[in-house]
Amino acid sequence: MEESETVLKLRLQLKEAEEERIKAAQYGLELLESQSDLQNQLEEQRNEMTSTIENLEQEKYSLQREVELKNRMLESLTSECENIRQQQKLCLEQLQEQLERNHHRELSEIKDKLEKLKAELDEARLSEKQLKHKLEYQSEVLANKSEELRMMSERVHETMSSEMLTLQLEKTELESAKANLEQEVNELQYREQQLLLTNGTQSRQLERLQDEKEDREKEAVGYFKALEKAREANQDLQAQLDIALQQAQDPNSKGNSLFAEVEDRRAEMERQLISMKVQFQSLQKQHAFSRQQMHRMKVQIATLLQLKGSQSDPEQLERLQAMVAQKNSEFETLVMKVRQLEKSQQICENGPVANSSDGLGQGDETYYVDLLKMKLVNSSKEIEKIKDELSLQRMKALAESQRVLDLERKLFANDRHLKLSQGENMKLRVNLDEMKMKYEPDEIAKIRTQKRRKEQLPLDCAIDNTSATVTSGSQAHGLSDAIPEDMCPAESTVHRNLLKEDSSLSTKEQDLSSVAVKPIEPANGQPPKERKRVRIVENENDNQDINKRNTNNCSVTSTSPRSASEESTSESKRFDEEQEKRKQERKSRLRAPPVLHVPSKPAATTQCPQQ
């Protein structure tokens, strides 16, 4: 029984185990199926993830490329924007400069027109004033003539003798001579006023031309700076173009390895080195070309300055020749007038003697004769007074003209000396540059700082001033000795006062020149070099000697200040001797004034600009 129970239990257990095994198999199958499903799902998810990652990577790469492109485009756009800004800035600066130039040009034109209008207005006012004065004078002369005509018409009815008629005729002739002399005095005054006006206008025009010259020089400097900037910009662009071409042609510029990066850096450094070499060579060529151009320009400027300093002004020569011809014609007319007056005076002196022999028997007309003689004496006194006044005015005009001529001579000599010194200075600079290029080529290439140079006065100015004062003093003494003996005391005193003023002015100028300009001794203790000078002496022989000296000594040599002072003293003595000779000749021929003969081609040293 127990065995059957155990068999039953075992069978039950076996059934249960089979049932469990069947269930486990079923569960295992279900798990396998679920696992395979999960694996399939996982594969699908993995594939999806890889595809998405690849897409993201592609998108990332494309985005990076796009970002790089955008950055490049942005850089190009910024560079283009900067270039456009610079171009607009340059255009704006050019427009501003052009507007400023146009403005300056218009201002200069307006100033020129204003100066011309002012000069025309001054001339019109002066001419109007002179015409008014002439009209008043002519009206007075007309009134006097009408009064004389009325008196003559009243006296025609009266019975008069031939002597009275001759005396009246002489009186009318003397009055007409007086009127002519007054008219000449007025014309000389008008001419002096016109000369003063033209001198003022010319001085204003000279100042305006100097201002225009400075403006033109500033414009030239601005143009040169702009040209240098354009050249520098062109060189930079050329270097950038060379670098870009080298980068485009370099095959080793691509790669991601370390060696490729090193190669890229080396190529970049080589490109930079090549660009620097190209820039250096271009700068060297430009520097050599600019040095050659500057050297040629300096040589040309020196030759032009020498030519300009040596040659004389043809307009000035023609003007001086015309003035000399005019003065000669005036002297000839004055000599003819003096001869006519002497003839008329002789006739008048012979006439009363013949009439006095006829009038011995006419005792009744002695009263009228005495009266007419008294009138004649009074008229002769008035004529002498008018002559004295005329001589005073002439002496004043001569003194003023002499001062003007002296000042113009000094100005011309200073201008010529300045031009010669500028030419010599330019020559010395050219020689200095040549020596530096020959012996110090490396130091010239260095950047030199701009230094200010002091312009010293030439040493010849002091001696020129002293010689001018000596000549002015000798001329004053000569003029004081040349006062004629038959001059009235009032005229002689006025003449002496004028000469004293001239001498005092000359001594003041000498003192100022001696104080202002002193000879500067060099550092080595040698005496300063000075130039030879030629003084202006109013004599034909001296002019011929000066011409010979100028033709023989074309090159300017240097002499000591002691020899120059000795020359000035010897020339002053010679001038005094010539003045004494002239005084003796003037005394020997009182009534025959000499005619001044001036050569048609005056020397270049005796010329001065006549306004």
UniProtKB/Swiss-Prot annotation:
Ranges in a coiled coil: 1-288
Protein location: Chromosome, Centromere, Kinetochore
Region Disordered, residue ranges: 499-611
Keyword entries, A-Z: Cell cycle, Cell division, Centromere, Chromosome, Coiled coil, Kinetochore, Mitosis
Superkingdom, natural source: Eukaryota
Alphabetized GO MF terms: kinetochore binding
An annotated GO cellular component: spindle pole
Chief location of this protein within or outside the cell: nucleus
Keyword Cell division found: yes
Biased composition (Basic and acidic residues): 499-511, 570-583
Family: Belongs to the Spindly family.
Primary role: Required for the localization of dynein and dynactin to the mitotic kintochore. Dynein is believed to control the initial lateral interaction between the kinetochore and spindle microtubules and to facilitate the subsequent formation of end-on kinetochore-microtubule attachments mediated by the NDC80 complex. May act as an adapter protein linking the dynein motor complex to various cargos.
Protein known as: Protein Spindly
Source organism (scientific name): Xenopus tropicalis
Lineage, opening ranks: Eukaryota, Metazoa, Chordata, Craniata, Vertebrata
